[in-house]
Amino acid sequence: MITGKLITVEGPDGAGKTTVLEQLIPLLKQKVAQEILTTREPGGVAISEYIRELILDINHTAMDPKTELLLYIAARRQHLVEKVLPALEAGQLVFIDRFIDSSVAYQGAGRGLIKADIQWLNEFATDGLEPDLTLYFDVPSEIGLARINANQQREVNRLDLETIEIHQRVRKGYLALAKEHPKRIVTIDATKPLKEVVSVALEHVLALLLA
């Protein structure tokens, strides 16, 4: 039985969501006694991390969009049963850096795959599990890509080679999802100063936990 809460973190490339999450968790630990787990997709467990390497390998430019989607779905399933569900059943507060919405935004809006097919695969992989809250960090594609290019410490992966048009379609896909699920997805302006973005995210998380 699930007694914990699931919060997912989403955003286009360069939105800074991972950095926000790194700063958010220590602040949250000062305010709640609940045990907190942070993890990521694709990855989080050994099998899923191996799949992550396949997906992001810069040499795999011939990867078909459906192959890419199915790899993400496989990684999602293994991660869920091995790590996420046990934590939720133990009453933990679980944060996942990317989840079901990423597939709809990237492989759906970005790659042009059929949304209904992606939603079916998501439901198949998760047994219908949905986040209690999704923090969507929004940033224009031009700003996001500029941030990525400015980060010299970040290793370039296959997805960094995509055109700005694909990144723009991904963002539009996310914005459409936010309109479709207004009770679950909160949109946060990620162009604001980092401290302000973290503060807004913290407010939304605490509102969920104290509801």
Swiss-Prot record:
Binding sites annotated in the UniProt record for ATP: 11-18
Q: Which CDD domains match?
A: TMPK
User: Mind telling me which HAMAP family this protein's record contains?
Assistant: Thymidylate_kinase
| Assigned keywords, A-Z | ATP-binding, Kinase, Nucleotide biosynthesis, Nucleotide-binding, Transferase
Q: What is this protein called?
A: Thymidylate kinase
Which class of enzymes does this protein belong to? transferase
E.C. number, please? 2.7.4.9
The entry assigns this protein to a family as follows: Belongs to the thymidylate kinase family.
Query: Highest lineage ranks of the organism?
Result: Bacteria, Bacillati, Bacillota, Bacilli, Lactobacillales
Which GO biological process entries does UniProt record here?
dTDP biosynthetic process; dTTP biosynthetic process; dUDP biosynthetic process
Q: What's one Pfam family the UniProt record gives for this protein?
A: Thymidylate_kin
Q: Does the keyword Methyltransferase apply?
A: no
Q: Which SUPFAM superfamilies match?
A: P-loop containing nucleoside triphosphate hydrolases
Kindly state which reaction or reactions the protein catalyses: dTMP + ATP = dTDP + ADP
What is the stated purpose of this protein?
Answer: Phosphorylation of dTMP to form dTDP in both de novo and salvage pathways of dTTP synthesis.
* GO terms for MF: ATP binding; dTMP kinase activity
User: Which domain of life does the protein's organism represent?
Assistant: Bacteria
For this record, an example GO cellular component is: cytosol
User: What InterPro entries does this protein map onto?
Assistant: P-loop_NTPase, Thymidylate_kin-like_dom, Thymidylate_kinase
